[in-house]
UniProtKB/Swiss-Prot annotation:
Residues 1-85 are annotated as: Disordered. The lineage of its organism: Bacteria, Pseudomonadati, Pseudomonadota, Gammaproteobacteria, Alteromonadales. Specifically methylates the adenine in position 1618 of 23S rRNA. This is Ribosomal RNA large subunit methyltransferase F. Residues 1-12 have a biased composition (Basic residues). The gene is rlmF. InterPro entries: METTL16/RlmF, rRNA_lsu_MeTfrase_F, SAM-dependent_MTases_sf. It holds the Pfam family Methyltransf_10. It catalyses: adenosine(1618) in 23S rRNA + S-adenosyl-L-methionine = N(6)-methyladenosine(1618) in 23S rRNA + S-adenosyl-L-homocysteine + H(+).
Length: 398
């Protein structure tokens, strides 16, 4: 199989494109050509590194261009320059008691306070994404909006490659204005949780339709309540309960379904004890950071911000076992989904995934690295369709 040639997507610090070889080995990185159209970097961005393009049979991973949002966020991410707390308090007055100047004179909140974080999310969804109501029950994960919407922006770029230009025109990638929008794009969110954040943002930003699945009836009931209180979401998001805790796609994807992409933020801990240690570590890091900046650190036992139910935080075998099950099941539905994707929190889990993707016959594998402040998040994407099938899929969709 000839390695595909394609440019790096915008905003990613590193893009590794891989296409399985004919031999029984792990996927090989494919070559990439230089991007001709790059979004303009913002003033605080680092100098951009040139992409490499060497059409060799065996190529090394290619460094994509470092793009310009101040936090390393995608160029289309609205939150690259921080939060406008004055505007947020105007839309959500309940947030005001939790906002205060930090030692540098900038407005902020205590991110260890679950009430403050939840109200910040509500304000962001109201101000930037046109939602009037959003809430989660106590004890469920409260997702950071900037990082969640970043995942969607990268997926939009991935879909853009399968969207032909209008009237036979030649597309130039990366083309940040060509990300497919509208209800003909259908996505499947695995493990949507009680917050339903990916379907909510995906519809409000790109107009995509979503199927959201979860193993927890309480979570789906809460997402149903969010939909009911935002009339613009009626008929755009459908919910499906996974009745088998050992299955991911099986029992959710139906024979008539066609998904442009699947997405998932998998549970990354292997046990409740491991998840609890992770929460304690985050709280200690926040407290240490506050002391270093001169903030008063209050003693509190509340951990909702780093809370979450079992299905949200951990599963037997942890992230690696979950991803392995997802990859094996995806083979069964390979002709029904254009792209399968998942976040990967631990870099060491990538190699086992590459080997398994080779075994199940994935035609192409992508690894995207997204920088969000000091945090590095990876998106693993794979497809069982050929480039020709991708083109036909995009042509049929648009």
């Amino acid at each position: 199989m000839t390695p595909s040639r394609k440019p790096a997507r915008p905003g990613a610090k590193k893009v590794v494109s891989q296409e399985p070889s004919a031999k029984a080995s792990r996927p090989k990185p494919s070559s990439q050509s230089k991007s001709k159209a790059q979004p303009k970097a913002k003033p605080e961005s680092k100098p951009q590194a040139k992409s490499q393009a060497k059409p060799q049979a065996k190529s090394k991973p290619v460094e994509g261009k470092s793009q310009g949002a101040s936090k390393g966020l995608h160029p289309r991410n609205l939150h690259g320059q921080g939060y406008d707390f004055d505007a947020l308090m105007d839309t959500t007055p309940e947030l005001k008691p939790f906002v205060r100047p930090n030692p540098y004179g900038n407005l902020s909140i205590d991110f260890a306070d679950p009430r403050a974080v939840k109200l910040l999310n509500l304000a962001l969804l109201r101000l930037h994404y046109g939602l009037s109501y959003w809430d989660i029950p106590e004890g469920f994960l409260c997702p950071p909006i900037p990082g969640r919407v970043d995942y969607l922006h990268y997926l939009a770029d991935l879909l853009a490659e399968s969207t032909p230009a209008s009237k036979g025109g030649k597309r130039k990638l990366p083309n940040v204005t060509r990300a497919p929008k509208g209800e003909r794009v259908v996505a499947l969110d695995i493990g949507t949780g009680a917050n339903g954040i990916y379907p909510l943002l995906g519809h409000q930003v790109y107009g995509w339709r979503f199927v959201a699945s979860d193993i927890d009836p309480v979570s789906l009931k809460n997402v149903e309540r969010i939909i009911a209180n935002n009339p613009q979401l009626a008929g755009k998001l459908s919910l499906r309960l996974q009745s088998d805790s050992k299955q991911i796609f099986t029992g959710i994807i139906r024979a008539e379904d066609r998904f442009d992409l699947t997405l998932c933020n998998p549970p990354f801990h292997a046990s409740l004890a491991e998840a609890s240690r992770g929460s304690e570590r985050k709280l200690k890091n926040l407290a240490a950071n506050k002391r270093a900046k001169g903030h008063e650190v209050a003693k509190s036992k509340e951990k909702l911000n780093f809370g979450g139910q079992k299905a949200e935080l951990w599963c037997e075998g942890g992230e690696q076992a979950f991803l392995g099950q997802m990859i094996r099941e995806s083979q069964k539905f390979g002709s029904q989904c254009l792209w399968f994707t998942s976040l990967v929190s631990k870099k060491e889990n990538l190699k086992p995934c590459y080997r398994l993707l080779e075994q199940v016959g994935a035609k192409r594998v992508e690894t995207l690295e997204m920088a969000q402040g000091n945090k590095l998040t990876r998106v693993l994407a794979w497809t069982f369709l050929t480039p020709e099938q991708h083109s036909l899929w995009g042509l049929y969709r648009v």
